[in-house]
Amino acid sequence: MAETATIARPYAEALFRVASEAGNLGAWSELVSEMGQIAANPDIKALADDPNVPGDKLGDLFLSVVKSPVNDEARRFVKLLVENNRLTVMPEVAEQFHALKNAREGSSDVEITSAFPLDGQPLNDLVAALERKFGRKLYAKVAVDPSLIGGVSVKVGDEVLDTSVRARLAAMQTALTAV
């Protein structure tokens, strides 16, 4: 949703500046990701949208669920989100924060979808090959989709490499019906 992204951008940029100045992007990245996951929870969303829940209680409740250590800057950030009725955009803030971190580090996220579970050495080999192809460090998120039949589908940014059997069958069908 473009509107959510637009609303979240200044929050993500401000939080990224604070994390950069503190010099611990790794710890901040973990904290922001966790806060994004918590804010995406339907129960938290319902509380955030409930006008009968006081803001200070909502902020305290939200922070009590966070397992990572929460510093004063993060507490103030959550308070700011709650005061501006923006806690529900935290998942998008986390996504944009992560994108800013990746841009700074010259890395990217890669979404790998496989027909079968992929882990261990085969996953490491695939990620290494993809890092050579894209020329940057990649952080893999792996999903399983049996409908691929075989092979993998890889998404890095807006680039997609689909070597799945399903994609090959679709290409054959297109070629055969075009005649």
UniProtKB/Swiss-Prot annotation:
Membrane topology: Peripheral membrane protein
Alphabetized InterPro entries for the sequence: ATP_synth_OSCP/delta_N_sf, ATPase_OSCP/dsu
Coiled coil: none
KW Nucleotide-binding (keyword) present: no
Subcellular location: Cell inner membrane
Main location: membrane
Function: F(1)F(0) ATP synthase produces ATP from ADP in the presence of a proton or sodium gradient. F-type ATPases consist of two structural domains, F(1) containing the extramembraneous catalytic core and F(0) containing the membrane proton channel, linked together by a central stalk and a peripheral stalk. During catalysis, ATP synthesis in the catalytic domain of F(1) is coupled via a rotary mechanism of the central stalk subunits to proton translocation.
Similarity annotation: Belongs to the ATPase delta chain family.
Quaternary structure, from the entry: F-type ATPases have 2 components, F(1) - the catalytic core - and F(0) - the membrane proton channel. F(1) has five subunits: alpha(3), beta(3), gamma(1), delta(1), epsilon(1). F(0) has three main subunits: a(1), b(2) and c(10-14). The alpha and beta chains form an alternating ring which encloses part of the gamma chain. F(1) is attached to F(0) by a central stalk formed by the gamma and epsilon chains, while a peripheral stalk is formed by the delta and b chains.
Protein name per Swiss-Prot or TrEMBL: ATP synthase subunit delta
Organism of derivation: Cupriavidus pinatubonensis (strain JMP 134 / LMG 1197)
Gene that specifies this protein: atpH
